[in-house]
């Protein structure tokens, strides 16, 4: 069973590193009022040498990220959407509950309107589907947490002064 997590981990990597920016860019070109505010992205934040210098040795920043990743990604989003809502949605949506759950997950990210299509697509195919298919919330937790692990290594590099 757990070998099935590998294709979904590869899928989230390809999705996040190659396809999300294209899909989100297309979305924003159709609806420019949903564009990301200037200077809002993590990339813009980390491009400032002044900020990078301040974060060297700032272990509190790394700890804050880890706590946020645990409570938001794992305990918040995954156990709420896949552990609580998905099984209950099957009563209404039947075998298409995973699609409805992924769409709901995407619109949960309404505070980042430029990324709604990306959140819907990843929510449906990379988080909700494996959880539904294998009847294990851990499938969604592991795949979704891969994103957090990636960012944890980036932030660790900043704190260690490697960036």
Residue ranges and their predicted role:
Residues 1-72, 161-163:
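Juxtamembrane helix-loop-helix connectors linking adjacent transmembrane helices
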Residues 1-5, 61-66, 94-101, 116, ...:
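Residue-level signature of transmembrane alpha-helical entry/exit and packing/kink sites
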Residues 18-19, 63, 77-81, 96, ...:
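Residue-level signal for transmembrane alpha-helical positions in Major Facilitator Superfamily
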Residues 29, 76-100, 129-136:
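Membrane-interface helix/loop boundary segments of multi-pass membrane proteins
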Residues 51-59, 87, 113-127:
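Short, motif-level signal for alpha-helix interfacial/capping segments enriched in acidic residues
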Residues 69, 73-74, 82-83, 105, ...:
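Active-site alpha-helix of zinc metalloproteases
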Residues 72, 84-93, 108-115:
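Short, amphipathic, aromatic/basic-enriched membrane-interface segments that mark the entry/exit
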Residues 99-108, 114-163:
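Functionally important transmembrane alpha-helices
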């Amino acid at each position: 069973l757990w070998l099935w997590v590998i294709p979904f981990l590869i899928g989230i990597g390809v999705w996040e590193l190659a396809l999300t920016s294209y899909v989100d860019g297309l979305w924003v070109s159709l609806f420019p009022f949903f564009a990301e505010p200037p200077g809002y992205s993590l990339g813009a934040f980390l491009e400032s040498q002044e900020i990078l210098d301040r974060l060297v040795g700032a272990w509190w920043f790394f700890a804050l990220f880890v706590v946020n990743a645990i409570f938001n990604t794992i305990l918040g989003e995954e156990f709420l959407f896949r552990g609580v809502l998905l099984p209950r949605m099957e009563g209404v949506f039947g075998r298409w509950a995973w699609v409805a759950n992924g769409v709901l997950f995407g619109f949960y990210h309404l505070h980042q309107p430029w990324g709604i299509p990306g959140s819907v697509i990843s929510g449906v195919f990379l988080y909700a589907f494996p959880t539904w298919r294998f009847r294990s919330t851990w499938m969604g937790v592991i795949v979704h947490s891969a994103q957090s692990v990636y960012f944890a290594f980036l932030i660790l590099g900043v704190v260690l002064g490697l960036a």
